[in-house]
Design a protein with these regions (language model features):
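Ubiquitin-like/PB1-type beta-grasp interaction modules and other compact soluble beta-rich domains
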Residues: 1-72
Length: 73
């Protein structure tokens, strides 16, 4: 199972999907597009304590983390 982890002001929400199930992968890809379109940054782990920002959906990533755009003021 792969996970999309969405960080927001309420904490985090995890959405899991089976990479072998086409319908679930399509739903996860739509969620990826919706979140990145709303300004979230998507990243995958690239090593211990490291992450890499991604711009397109990778269904083979074990975990994709989404975090909101930082706003200063």
């Amino acid at each position: 199972m792969a996970s999309l982890i969405v960080m927001d002001r309420t904490g985090d929400t995890r959405h899991t999907f089976d990479i072998q199930d086409r319908a679930e992968v399509e739903k996860a890809e739509r969620r990826f597009r919706d979140l990145t379109g709303a300004g979230f940054t998507a990243a995958v782990r690239s090593g211990p304590g490291e992450q890499r920002v991604i711009r397109s959906f990778d269904p083979t990533a074990e975990e994709t983390l989404f975090y909101p755009r930082l706003v200063g003021g």
